[in-house]
Swiss-Prot record:
InterPro entries (UniProt xref): PsdUridine_synth_cat_dom_sf, PsdUridine_synth_TruA, PsdUridine_synth_TruA_a/b_dom, PsdUridine_synth_TruA_C, TruA/RsuA/RluB/E/F_N
Reaction(s) catalysed by this chain's protein: uridine(38/39/40) in tRNA = pseudouridine(38/39/40) in tRNA
Keyword Isomerase: yes
PANTHER family with a match to the protein in the record: PSEUDOURIDYLATE SYNTHASE, TRNA PSEUDOURIDINE SYNTHASE-LIKE 1
GO biological process: tRNA pseudouridine synthesis
Active site as annotated: 52 (nucleophile)
Quaternary structure, from the entry: Homodimer.
Record Pfam families: PseudoU_synth_1
Protein name (Swiss-Prot/TrEMBL): tRNA pseudouridine synthase A
Binding site for substrate: 111
Molecular function via GO: RNA binding; tRNA pseudouridine(38-40) synthase activity
Organism expressing this protein natively: Thermosipho africanus (strain TCF52B)
Lineage of source species: Bacteria, Thermotogati, Thermotogota, Thermotogae, Thermotogales
Keywords: Isomerase, tRNA processing
Physiological role: Formation of pseudouridine at positions 38, 39 and 40 in the anticodon stem and loop of transfer RNAs.
Length: 244
């Protein structure tokens, strides 16, 4: 039996997150429903990450076993796109080893977070955090540098579901793409639940001048969620790319 991986994008606005749940719409649920329509049996998938409600993806990766041996990568891509709703799109498909699990095989995950400090654009309200205050980008960059490397990120996680809060952030870049549009790019192998959004919330506190950049070190050392700033809203976040 062949095993395929797919890279796909989705607009997270109308989903209750990635992971399948009963009685609500999820990305995994829609993906597996599409596979069931194609193969006339339930096909279960494994994904590289589980995004929260409202979070988007440009490069999510999932894998599944294909019960029809003759199907090609192009067949899989085309069949899925013909059966998926218009807020999910499969960009490519490829054959993988039978043991491939994208969650554990990933060597890097890249997240993008977009902040707009411009006047509110109602057409972009589900895709950027509209934040009507100027931010000190240089101060945010300095604060972000303290988060790079291996740390206990207990202060930036949600809940108590992670037994090991130690993670490694390879790099954080903060870019001004055009006037009033800011991109925060976070690269790491894996992340705790809501970790990127919690980091963004604290970097914004620095950008406002409410915290000095060095405050981030103190927050890390306290290892308590209460020490960090509030969580940035989900609609500015994108799972941009997963590397293997």
């Amino acid at each position: 039996m062949k095993r395929f991986a797919i890279e796909f994008a989705y607009d997270g606005t109308k989903f209750f997150g990635y992971q399948g749940q009963p009685n609500v719409r999820t990305v995994q649920g829609d993906l597996e429903d599409a596979l069931e329509r194609i193969f006339k049996e339930r096909i279960y998938t494994q994904a590289a990450g589980r995004t929260d409600a409202g979070v988007h993806a440009n490069g999510q990766v999932a894998a599944f076993n294909c019960p029809i041996e003759r199907l090609t990568e192009t067949d899989i891509k085309n069949a899925l796109n013909a059966n998926l709703p218009d807020d999910i799109y499969v960009k490519k498909a490829w054959v993988v080893d039978k043991s491939f699990n994208p969650r554990f095989a990933a060597t890097k995950r890249i997240y993008h977070y977009f902040i707009s400090t411009n006047e509110k654009d109602v057409f972009m309200r589900n895709y950027v955090w509209n934040f009507r205050y100027d931010l000190d980008i240089e101060a945010m960059r300095k604060a972000a540098s303290f988060l790079e490397g291996e740390h206990d990120f207990s202060s930036f996680k949600k809940g108590k579901d992670e037994k090991n809060p130690v993670r490694t952030i390879y790099r954080i870049r903060i870019l001004t793409l055009k006037k009033g549009l800011i991109l925060i790019r976070v690269e790491g192998r894996s992340f705790l639940r809501s970790m990127v959004r919690n980091i963004v919330g604290s970097l914004v506190r620095v950008g406002l001048g409410q915290w000095k950049p060095e405050k981030i070190l103190e927050v890390l050392e306290k290892r308590s969620r209460q020490e960090a700033a509030g969580t940035a809203p989900p609609h500015g976040l994108y799972l941009y790319k997963v590397l293997f």
